[in-house]
Amino acid sequence: MSEIGERVKKIVVEHLGVEPEKVVETASFIDDLGADSLDTVELVMAFEEEFGCEIPDDAAETILTVGDATKFLEKNAKS
């Protein structure tokens, strides 16, 4: 996992309280990690804060897995 991927993983573990080994690229926030819609909004906000970028609503709707978040942030992160 990339450095950004590791940071994404850390945020997911902290916000969802899941075991780190469950946070893999293909893990769905809702189906695999037990997030609800509020959790996903909070994750997006945490990603924005951690990486210094804005995630527009239309982009946020496409971030369904850990891998989706990592790919988006690798392209758009400022820090």
UniProtKB/Swiss-Prot annotation:
Localisation per UniProt entry: Cytoplasm
Keyword tags: Cytoplasm, Fatty acid biosynthesis, Fatty acid metabolism, Lipid biosynthesis, Lipid metabolism, Phosphopantetheine, Phosphoprotein
Role: Carrier of the growing fatty acid chain in fatty acid biosynthesis.
PTM: 4'-phosphopantetheine is transferred from CoA to a specific serine of apo-ACP by AcpS. This modification is essential for activity because fatty acids are bound in thioester linkage to the sulfhydryl of the prosthetic group.
Gene it is expressed from: acpP
Gene3D superfamilies with a match to the protein in the record: ACP-like (1.10.1200.10)
Xref: InterPro entries: ACP (IPR003231), ACP-like_sf (IPR036736), PP-bd_ACP (IPR009081), Ppantetheine_attach_site (IPR006162)
Native source organism of the sequence: Afipia carboxidovorans (strain ATCC 49405 / DSM 1227 / KCTC 32145 / OM5)
This protein's record includes keyword Phosphoprotein: yes
Name the record gives this protein: Acyl carrier protein
